[in-house]
């Protein structure tokens, strides 16, 4: 069962009425394990940056963390799927901070079959609440026999997936698609990890035709990493070394405890 808290206390019907009827907020999601989060600082930076853009208001990390700790303490949990949503409201600075807690989730392990579609999110740099197109394209991809949608911009460049970023691997270099997309926290953690490991990386335009064997590819988001099996029926390599390399890169980035002080 999902539990929702608003500004550090259990949410009321009135607290949730606005977010239920509008889509003018923004959010971040992550997996909490033993009261620690990979890339917690990146999630806090995301929330503050989006609040400044959408609402012309800073969102102090201490406020977010106080609300998160209060929610975790209220249900006495150390592991959860967490969503923090920021919406206009009666809270400090005219903003309400909603913390939603659900059961912890693990990534699917089966490689994904993707169906490409020409689509680019509005205000792509912000993780905003206008998610209908993402899940509608995902639904259509599944109806067509794929597992998810791969977004390609009007110029024919691969940019991102429905709720994930992606990278390519040729055995020596990780390639990150260049384009107007939401830059994910897991993507940034992996980039830092590959740098720490000395793995070569590049960011450049990628076209769907590149996504086939002998190239391998993976999807990543806050839930984890997942290999990509095919795009539009064209198989990619399933390099058995890539999942281990991704895990090694992530392992260089220590989780951050939610009870530690934040700046």
How should these model regions be labeled?
Residues 71-76:
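Phosphate/pyrophosphate-binding loops at sites that engage ATP/ADP/AMP, CoA/4′-phosphopantetheine
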Residues 1-70, 87, 91-263:
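Helix-start/capping segments and mature chain N-termini
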Residues 77-86:
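Ordered, amphipathic secondary-structure segments that act as subunit-interaction surfaces
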